[in-house]
């Protein structure tokens, strides 16, 4: 997971992960804000959960989780991504892991797009059904994707729209299967969410990638 502005959410995330059943959780945190490092470290010290931090000197957004996943890929076939503004029950991580498959990603936020594609006219898919986009908040994915150097060649101006880029690389460049997960999450409304400042960029990036061949009728 990544952290940036909300250290007060981190203890709740730890408690949710501590409560998971049927799995052994190890948490890797990419922190984009050195100013909250001490708060995060203190919370982790009070938890029985194994936690490893990377405190980055500048905010690189959700791309940080891709760097963590690349480090883990040689030894772990799958990784689960969560966000700090999510609430989830004790069986959630086990459900995600039960859906793990080679060359695939399964996640809670999963959509298809109309033609012509428009990000904000996206169409939700049912649980277990194929998607063209899967968000990184509440996802299990084959870590082989993080050994593909193309994933780290995202255009600089769209670096903070890494969720769209990941779906493009997985779906279009690699032909992977994307699906809606059967796991359930609740989200905490928060105006500090980085997503709120990327409304225009998400559609611009989708159009940019469509011009490069993604989301054609198939």
Which role does the model predict for each range below?
Residues 31-42:
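A conserved acidic beta->alpha catalytic loop
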Residues 1-12, 33:
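Active-site beta-to-alpha loop of glycosyltransferases that engages the nucleotide-sugar donor
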Residues 46-60:
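Conserved donor nucleotide-binding strand/loop of the catalytic core
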């Amino acid at each position: 997971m990544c952290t940036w502005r909300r250290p007060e959410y981190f203890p709740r995330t730890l408690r949710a992960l501590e409560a998971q059943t049927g799995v052994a959780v190890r948490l890797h945190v990419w922190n984009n804000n050195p100013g909250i490092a001490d708060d995060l470290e203190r919370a982790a010290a009070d938890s029985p959960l194994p936690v490893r931090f990377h405190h980055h000197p500048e905010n690189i957004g959700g791309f940080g989780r891709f760097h963590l996943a690349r480090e883990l890929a040689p030894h772990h076939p799958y990784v689960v991504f969560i966000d700090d503004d999510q609430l989830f029950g004790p069986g959630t991580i086990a459900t995600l892991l039960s859906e793990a498959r080679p060359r695939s990603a399964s996640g809670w936020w999963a959509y298809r797009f109309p033609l012509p594609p428009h990000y904000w006219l996206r169409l939700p898919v049912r649980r277990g059904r194929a998607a063209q986009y899967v968000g990184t908040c509440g996802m299990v994915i084959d870590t082989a994707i993080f050994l593909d150097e193309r994933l780290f060649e995202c255009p600089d101006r769209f670096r903070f729209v890494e969720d769209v880029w990941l779906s493009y690389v997985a779906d279009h460049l690699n032909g992977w299967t994307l699906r809606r997960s059967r796991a359930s999450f609740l989200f905490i409304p928060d105006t500090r969410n980085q997503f709120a400042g990327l409304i225009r960029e998400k559609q611009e990036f989708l159009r940019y990638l469509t011009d490069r061949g993604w989301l054609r009728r198939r």
